[in-house]
């Protein structure tokens, strides 16, 4: 009993002592922790106090440094500006020189004029390692690089120009070097009569109320039918093929025209399409070109036979009037038609031929009369 009473008295005291010890321990621990925490923060701040806080701009440089940097930047910008101007002037000069060379000289002439320069550029000067200044050495290297670069640029220009001229040639030159097939051996003596289309055999007109209309020239049927017996007849026009072929089919249903040549067979030069008679695969001594614009529309005016342009005149007889001269040529077969045509001096051949024929008949009759007189 006494032990129970003693135990009940001691337990509350032990509990109080225990709670006091816990309070002291916790207070010391808390003071220790707080002290260590604040001391840690303070030490950390002191260690990194020389660096700016995060996400803050750096301090401005001193005024002298800033002024020097601005001056250096200004010089760099000025240097780049001058360099840009120099490159622009160099590019402009190169473009102008290229354009002038392309306009003034052919590719063969440019190749011949620059041949010596390009050959000298390939001979790079030998740089000796001893006995030469460093500046001279670099100057020699720069000179060699400039010469080599210029020579390569010229080679590239010639290559590109050749490619471009080949492409342009496909549009300006006739489709083939031989526009007509070979003449049959039995027809080697036959002359070739080349006829223009517009204002020569027909006339194309446009009016608002009816649109385009094509009119045959008076006498064209008789002209083709009669001369088809003596000549190889070829139509050579500067119009598109889609126009030439159907028009010729309606113009010549009997097939007196053997071949039809359109714009693709012409040579484009100085903004105009020319007939190149040298590409017909025929003897130029036996070619006659009849056109209302004969001397202006062919590259061989010495083969031209001019005729009055047809402009829908009802009394036009130019084709019929030309038949006697063309028949005379076909029957007599001159060795070269070109001096014969040159003797007419670009006059109206049909009228001039009739006048010459009449004069010849008069002279012939006079000679016959004189012969009879002497025989008496």
Swiss-Prot record:
Residues 108-376 are mitochondrial intermembrane. InterPro entries: FCP1_dom (IPR004274), HAD-like_sf (IPR036412), HAD_sf (IPR023214), TIM50 (IPR050365). Residues 186-329 form the FCP1 homology domain. It comes from the Eukaryota. Residues 1-25 form a transit peptide. It is a single-pass membrane protein. One of its GO terms (biological process) is protein transport. CDD domains: HAD_FCP1-like. Residues 32-48 have a biased composition (Polar residues). Expressed in young cotyledons, roots, flowers and leaves. Component of the TIM17:23 complex at least composed of TIM23, TIM17 and TIM50. Interacts with TIM23-2. This is Mitochondrial import inner membrane translocase subunit TIM50. It comes from Arabidopsis thaliana (Mouse-ear cress).
């Amino acid at each position: 009993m006494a032990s129970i009473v003693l135990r009940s008295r001691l337990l509350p005291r032990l509990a109080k002592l225990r709670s006091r010890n816990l309070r002291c321990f916790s207070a010391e621990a808390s003071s220790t922790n707080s002290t260590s925490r604040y001391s840690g923060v303070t030490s950390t701040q002191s260690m990194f106090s020389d660096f700016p806080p995060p996400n803050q701009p750096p301090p401005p440089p001193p005024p002298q440094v800033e002024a020097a940097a601005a001056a250096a930047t200004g010089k760099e910008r000025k240097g780049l500006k001058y360099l840009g101007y120099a490159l622009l002037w160099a590019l402009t000069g190169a473009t102008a020189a290229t354009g002038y060379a392309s306009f003034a000289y052919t590719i063969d002439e440019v190749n011949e004029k620059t041949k010596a320069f390009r050959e000298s550029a390939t001979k790079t000067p030998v740089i000796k390692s001893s006995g030469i200044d460093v500046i001279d050495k670099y100057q020699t290297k720069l000179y060699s690089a400039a010469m080599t670069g210029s020579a390569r640029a010229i080679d590239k220009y010639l290559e590109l120009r050749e490619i471009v001229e080949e492409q342009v040639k496909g549009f300006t030159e006739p489709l083939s070097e031989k526009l007509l097939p070979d003449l049959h051996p039995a027809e080697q003596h036959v002359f070739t009569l080349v006829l223009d289309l517009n204002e020569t055999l027909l006339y194309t007109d446009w009016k608002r109320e009816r649109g385009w209309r094509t009119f045959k020239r008076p006498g064209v049927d008789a002209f083709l039918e009669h001369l088809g017996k003596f000549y190889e007849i070829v139509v050579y026009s500067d119009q598109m093929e889609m126009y030439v072929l159907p028009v010729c089919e309606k113009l010549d249903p009997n097939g007196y025209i053997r071949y039809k040549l359109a714009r693709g067979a012409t040579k484009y030069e100085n903004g105009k399409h020319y007939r190149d008679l040298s590409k017909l695969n025929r003897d130029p001594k036996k070619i006659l070109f009849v056109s209302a614009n004969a001397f202006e529309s062919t590259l061989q005016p010495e083969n031209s036979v001019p005729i009055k342009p047809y402009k829908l005149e009802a009394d036009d007889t130019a084709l019929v009037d030309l038949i006697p001269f063309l028949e005379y040529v076909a029957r007599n077969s001159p060795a070269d038609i070109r001096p014969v045509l040159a003797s007419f001096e670009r006059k109206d051949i049909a009228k001039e031929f009739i006048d010459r024929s009449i004069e010849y008949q008069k002279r012939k009759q006079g000679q016959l009369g004189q012969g009879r007189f002497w025989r008496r």
